[in-house]
């Protein structure tokens, strides 16, 4: 079994989502020490954003590509293969200005690939090709954006990830949420404790 672990927070050791993904991964590894583990820190080692050069590369001979573009395209192939090969994917999702980090968006753009993770049928219907992976999202939010809160409509991180994963056929991600983390020390401690309880309840 292969485990892919992704962190995307820019906050380093202060990051709540990193603490949560580490706890989730530790639980999974304790249950199966033979797990093949791949880690990618999308903030420390960001993936380049797509550009017109990437689109043009598909239409032109490889010999016309600059070394920088060739290396970037090779990284994209590697990132996609890591996702395709994984049986379980654990993703740290920090909420920035109502949505995911730009670093995580760059990763999403490399794994939502027509013909690889989704396709359209002859009738025009969407078909996800990502298989039956287990996906666990560790969502960290400074405020309170949960269902029923006044700001719930502004939450576009968890909702975006659910949409992107559903697009490739992964419709049932497991979601751990820590929120209220920027509302003071007590609120942060309570939010992290609630998230850890969710992790403790995850099946292995």
UniProtKB/Swiss-Prot annotation:
GO terms for molecular function: electron transfer activity; FMN binding; oxidoreductase activity, acting on NAD(P)H as acceptor; oxidoreductase activity, acting on NAD(P)H, quinone or similar compound as acceptor. It is an enzyme of class 1 (oxidoreductase). Its EC number is 1.6.5.-, 1.7.1.17. FMN binds at residues 9, 15-17. SUPFAM superfamilies: Flavoproteins. Gene3D superfamilies: 3.40.50.360. InterPro entries: Flavodoxin_fold (IPR003680), Flavoprotein-like_sf (IPR029039), FMN-dep_NADH:Q_OxRdtase_AzoR1 (IPR050104), NADH:quinone_OxRdtase_FMN_depd (IPR023048). Binds 1 FMN per subunit. Its cofactor is FMN. Coiled coil: none annotated. It catalyses: 2 a quinone + NADH + H(+) = 2 a 1,4-benzosemiquinone + NAD(+); N,N-dimethyl-1,4-phenylenediamine + anthranilate + 2 NAD(+) = 2-(4-dimethylaminophenyl)diazenylbenzoate + 2 NADH + 2 H(+). Keywords: Flavoprotein, FMN, NAD, Oxidoreductase. Homodimer. Quinone reductase that provides resistance to thiol-specific stress caused by electrophilic quinones. HAMAP family: Azoreductase_type1. Belongs to the azoreductase type 1 family. This is FMN-dependent NADH:quinone oxidoreductase. It comes from Xanthomonas campestris pv. campestris (strain ATCC 33913 / DSM 3586 / NCPPB 528 / LMG 568 / P 25).
């Amino acid at each position: 079994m292969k485990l892919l672990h992704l962190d995307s927070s820019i906050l380093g050791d202060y990051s709540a989502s990193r603490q949560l993904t580490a706890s989730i991964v530790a639980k999974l590894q304790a249950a199966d020490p033979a797990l093949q583990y791949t880690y990618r820190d999308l903030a420390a080692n960001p993936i380049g954003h797509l550009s017109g050069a990437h689109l043009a590369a598909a239409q032109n001979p490889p010999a016309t590509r600059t070394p920088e573009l060739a290396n970037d395209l090779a990284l994209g192939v590697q990132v996609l293969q890591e996702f395709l090969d994984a049986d379980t994917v654990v993703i740290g999702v920090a909420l920035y200005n109502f949505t995911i980090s730009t670093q995580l968006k760059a990763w999403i753009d490399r794994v939502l690939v027509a013909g690889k993770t989704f396709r359209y049928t002859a009738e025009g219907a969407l078909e996800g090709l990502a298989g039956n992976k287990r996906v666990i999202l560790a969502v960290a939010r400074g405020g309170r954006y949960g269902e029923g809160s006044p700001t719930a409509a502004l939450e576009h991180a968890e909702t975006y990830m659910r949409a992107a994963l559903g697009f490739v056929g992964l419709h049932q991600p497991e979601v751990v949420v820590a929120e209220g983390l920027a509302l003071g020390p007590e609120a942060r401690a309570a939010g992290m404790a609630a998230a850890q309880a969710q992790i403790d309840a995850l099946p292995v």
